[in-house]
């Protein structure tokens, strides 16, 4: 007696494919395949901190948000890494200039700098502040905010 093998192998392959697909649907997709998963998790984790920090004002808020920005820059996917580097570098430069001068960012007034502040220290602070407010920094910050909305489906801050 000869058995027909015409449908045997294709039927087994079809059944295995259906079983595999059903298992995938039950378990769900694996986040390890998503290159943005850890970055988006970090965005969600830091939203409240960034929002609270930024409510303190332009430069001061960015200074307070710097630790969160640094973590997000470390988690950032390749396509937004350059923008994060600009943001972190510019905020860090202002922080460093203020720290080097021993100046409290919250109370610093460039029109009335503290006594004892040298011309070089004032210039370093002014230069860092101008670079932080520059068009390329604003574009980088806008880019990371847009990335959070588009890819992570959440704003960068509350």
In which residue ranges do the predicted regions lie?
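Short, intrinsically disordered, charge-biased short linear motifs at domain edges
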Residues: 19-30, 133-142
């Amino acid at each position: 007696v000869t058995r027909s093998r015409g449908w045997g192998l294709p039927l087994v392959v079809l059944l295995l494919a259906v079983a595999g697909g059903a298992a995938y649907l039950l378990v769900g997709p694996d986040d390890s395949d998503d290159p943005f998963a850890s970055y988006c998790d970090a965005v969600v984790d830091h939203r409240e901190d960034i929002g609270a920090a930024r409510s303190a004002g332009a430069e001061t808020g960015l200074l307070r948000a710097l630790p969160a920005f640094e973590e997000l820059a470390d988690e950032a996917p390749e396509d937004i890494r350059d923008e994060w580097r600009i943001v972190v570098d510019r905020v860090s430069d202002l922080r460093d200039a203020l720290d080097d001068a021993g100046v409290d960012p919250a109370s610093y007034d460039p029109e009335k700098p503290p006594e004892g502040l040298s011309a070089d220290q004032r210039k370093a602070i002014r230069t860092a502040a101008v670079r932080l407010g520059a068009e390329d920094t604003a574009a980088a910050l806008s880019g990371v905010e847009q990335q959070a909305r588009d890819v992570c489906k959440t704003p960068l801050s509350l």
